[in-house]
Structure formats: C-alpha cells, structure tokens
Amino acid sequence: MAAYKGAALVGETIDSVLSQTLQDFELVIVDDCSPDNTLEVLRGYTDPRITVIASPVNQGPVKTRNIAMNAARGRYLAGLDQDDICLPERLERQVGFLDAHPDVALVAAAADFLEEGLIRPGNARGPTTPALLQWRLHLHNALVWSSVMMRADVARQLDPITRPEMLFAEDFDLYHRIGKLGGIARIDEPLLHYRIHPGGVSKTYQSTMIANATRVLAEVYQPIFGTDADENARLVMLHVAEGRPVSDRKTFSRIGEIITALRGYLVEGKYDQADTVLVDRAISALWWRLVRTAIRAGKMSPRILALDRPKEARLADLKWGDILVSGMIGTVRRIA
C-alpha cells in the first residue's frame, strides 16, 4: 500500500486487512512524505504483520507502490489503495483461487462502490471468463487495482512492476504486461468496497489518466493496426472507455471497424463457443450503448440506426424504449 495524506481514512483500510479470515499475511505500507499525520497513524499500529516504511522523499504513487511490492516477502502480492475496504474473505478467496489455478498470474475481484457511507453495486457485475476479460482490457481498464492479487515471482519479472511514466494508468499497463506472462481472471463476487470521493477526480488526474491509458492501448494495438494504432486507441478511449458521445457518422463507422478488427484478432479461431458468445453479447451491448449515448446527447439523430454496424450488434438486443426517450432528450438538447 502507498500512503499519502491518508490519515483520515487509512485506519479503516488497515482494519479491513486485520479483519481478514486469512490471517497469514504481511501488510507493507510506504508513506510518501505525507505532510499530515499519516505516518503517525501508521506507526500507531503495533501488529507485527504490519511493516511501515517512510520514504525519505516524495516520489509519487507509482514509485511508492513499487517500493512496497519489492519489500513484500510473500508469494502473492495484493494491491490496495489507502482508502478502499477489503471484505473479510478477500485474501482467503484469492489465495485459494491462485493455489487452484497455477496458470493464472493475476486474479482480481468484483467491487462495490462506497460513497459517503453508502454501498451501491459496482458497474462491472455479471459473469466473466479470462477470455472476456482479455476482450474488455482491449477496450478499457476492466479491473479495480485494489481488488488485484498476483504471483510475486511473475510480477517481479517486470522491471519495474508498474511504470511511473504511465501515471494514473499504471495498473492498466500492468495488466497487459503481466498478461503476456500468465492468465488474468476475476472472482465475480464483490470482495472490495471501492471508495468514491465527493466531487470526483480532478481535471489534472482525468486528463493524465486518459492520455496514459491511450498510450497503453496504442502499444497494445500496434501489432493489430500498425500506423492507425494511435488514432484508434484515441477513439476507443474517448468513446468506449470514457463514454463521450460520438458526433459524426464517420467516427461511428470507424469504431465499428475497430471492434470488428479486434474481434478477428482476439476471438476468431481462438476462443471456444461459450467465450465467443460472451464477447459477442458484450459487443452488442457496447454498440447500442454508443448509439444511445450519441442520440441522448443530441449529437446524432435516431437515423444512425441505419448505419452499418458490427454483425454482433443484434437488433434484438436494442431497447427501443431507451432509444425513444434518448431521441426526445436529444431533440431538446439540439434545440437548446
């Protein structure tokens, strides 16, 4: 765990680790020169399983997290941010999963949101498979860092484990890098409460995250799209990952072509029938979400339904009521 100006919340996070059903763990926390009393709070814990390291200089979250992971002695590394809450069975469930699946390098878990004391379901509910996660990771960051556990010996084949130049997208980058060394899976039951802060993230954080996540996708897309990798990554990040409405037919068509090309590269002849069905359902849901978002924002009219679309986007999956409501909202916004 990396800690910085976390005095108000880090205690609750630490307590969630101490309350785990699996008690054979070590918790390594690196304080990144916090200007508040975070270090004092950390040193107030006397449990011998907790190791507190005080960084001599402020290095930022990525380097600080790498220090913590390199100091850990266990065979598995579990990620955790200073304000998130582990549910009691998190470590036990993930250790059991990795013990039972030696081909998996990293296992994540579903997460629910914790906002102002209230718990609400996370966005990524539903069953997953390693193949479906691979598909999703080619479109957006599909995993929550604080839910991740990975094999230490595999993670340390990466140098560094997380790259500082990918700030705020370093976890997304890690998933693709470690995915070349072993499988990635997810336990679909929520094992974490991911804290949402009032007011959301800063514009600086958001712009840096988008820029670096786009870089990650561009690297991944290079063998698929060649010279078009950068632009295709930009479009996918803006409209698929960030959900910004598409405003013209040309962009819609290009995104459809990207999805079709990705499916051909990842799925055809490689995924079994069950995984192919899951991916095709995901494509259909994604396409109609893009359509609905564009219409509702007033950027496009319902006539875009006549556009060529990926063959996996089935009309049977289209919720016509949503389209009608979105069309009315979009009309008002265009007039306004």
Predicted segments — roles?
Residues 8-11, 36-44, 85, 89:
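Acidic helix N-cap motif at the loop->helix transition within catalytic regions
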Residues 15-24:
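Short, acidic, metal-binding catalytic loop of nucleotide-sugar glycosyltransferases
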Residues 16, 31-40, 57, 81:
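A conserved acidic beta->alpha catalytic loop
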Residues 55-72, 93:
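Glycine-rich, basic loop-to-helix element that forms the pyrophosphate-binding segment
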Residues 70, 109, 127-242:
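Conserved nucleotide-sugar donor-binding catalytic segment
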Residues 77:
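Short aromatic/hydrophobic "clamp" motif used to bind/position activated sugar donors
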Residues 89-122:
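Conserved donor NDP-sugar-binding/catalytic core segment of glycosyltransferases
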Residues 159, 196-336:
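C-terminal subregions of glycosyltransferases and related glycan-biosynthesis enzymes
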